[in-house]
Amino acid sequence: MAVVLSACLLLLSACNSGNGESMVADGAIVVTDIRGKEVRLSEPADRVIVLYQGALDGMYMLHAEHTVVGIQNNIYTNPVSFKYFSKLDPRIARKELPAPGNWETSTNIESILALKPDLVIIASGQTDAIRLLEDLGIQVFAVSPQNNAQLFEEIESIGKLTGTSERAKELLAYTRAKLDEIREATKHIEHKKSVYYAWSGGRIYATSGQNSRMNECFELAGVRNACTFAIDQPNINPETLISWDPDLILLWSTNPQELYNKKELSVLKAVKNKNVHVLEPPFFYDPHTLKIMYAAIELHNVCYGENENFDLVENRREIMTNLYGAKATALLE
């Protein structure tokens, strides 16, 4: 990870700025992040840097975008992300929001400090950056939800940290009710179709195991994860995929032709029958956000087309409107 170590020279001034835990008064806002670490603020954050796309998405759902003063660079460099986040925030459309890092590769500590954040939201895997920021007295809320329970805790905690707790309650109440509705519609399926999920960018042999967000999506959709491994992100070989022989192959930001070009996979029934589906545009299906419910709805319809339970157009409109409010109109254009 390319972290700018020269930022350590700013340690003394940052520690004296009052951001440290020792300066927090009684009655502070206290939440626990994915690491199990307490994050404390004396009042709701006015200046937040968000370096994790799922959490940035959540900020707009929470109507907390007015607190965002920095984002991850990937929002600008990924054409699909830029297209939709531009619709959520004119500052992104004009490329005015500073981008001091990426969610998984690099973080510029000096640029973060220059923005004088009250809070930095960052992927828990960025351990070096987190350590430096916390050593410099910056409050860090680490994220990387692996299931709905953790995602709900993340939304609730960020709501508290940004003064949008009531909106967080609204979001979670709607989401829980919608998830119950989806489960009720899919629970009758006895013979579940098997689905293999391939990671983005043509990584056909990188998949999601039983302990993953996509597996949770599969269960909600009433399908079975073809991957039998208990781990989150296994890498497999062609022989293993052939032995699983899934009914459908689900792709993310990958051209199906990349799959069809792999001659060794021509024996798969999903390939023979062209049962390959791409969730696109990916913005509407991000499993690291509350939009996992829409991904499940579409996957269910794709797998059980003869007995569709959901109107995709109506559900997209309903879900996005409840998640984003008035901003959903621009997203759905």
Predicted regions, residues:
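Proline-aspartate-enriched helix->loop->beta-strand connector
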Residues: 97, 103, 108-122, 138, ...
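Alpha-helical, coiled-coil/dimerization segments enriched in small aliphatic residues
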Residues: 206-233
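A short, structured surface patch at a secondary-structure boundary
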Residues: 56-111, 119
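C-terminal motif of bacterial Sec signal peptides marking the signal peptidase cleavage site
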Residues: 11-14
